[in-house]
């Protein structure tokens, strides 16, 4: 029996991990929250969900799905993302950004 999401196996899934520099947790949270609404209006967006680690406040994850790599690439050059890139160095700790691209296999 097929699952309801089988037709979506071609999506590009991204998990972005971001950890705030000490004392910058609230600033990073606000900056990340400001990315959600404009991203959800982008072409190729499927979902763009921001989470915070309940055991490690100030550690955030975006769980994203995109129609294609081209849509993700366009997202990464969108004005709201380039503005964030300009300030993220002040908000993240030294190991504070990891982006993982995934493809669904089952």
Residue ranges and their predicted role:
Residues 1-12, 50-56, 86-106:
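Glycine-rich beta-strand-turn "strand-cap" elements at beta-sheet edges
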Residues 3, 7, 19, 23, ...:
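Residues at secondary-structure transition points
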Residues 5, 32-37, 52, 68:
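Generic hydrophobic alpha-helical membrane-segment signal
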Residues 8-41, 46:
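N-terminal first-folded block
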Residues 12-19, 49-76:
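Short, well-ordered beta-strand segments in beta-rich or mixed alpha/beta enzyme
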Residues 37-46, 65-98:
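An amphipathic, aromatic/His-enriched active-site/gating alpha helix that lines ligand/cofactor pockets
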């Amino acid at each position: 029996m097929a699952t309801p999401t089988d037709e979506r196996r071609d999506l590009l899934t991204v998990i972005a991990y971001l950890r705030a520099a000490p004392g910058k947790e609230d600033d990073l949270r606000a900056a990340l929250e400001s990315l959600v609404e404009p991203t959800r209006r982008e072409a190729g967006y499927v979902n763009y969900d921001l989470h915070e680690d309940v055991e490690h406040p100030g550690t955030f994850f975006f769980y994203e799905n995109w129609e294609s790599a081209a849509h993700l690439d366009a997202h990464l050059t969108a004005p709201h993302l380039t503005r964030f890139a300009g300030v993220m160095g002040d908000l993240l700790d030294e190991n504070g950004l990891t982006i993982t691209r995934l493809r669904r296999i089952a």
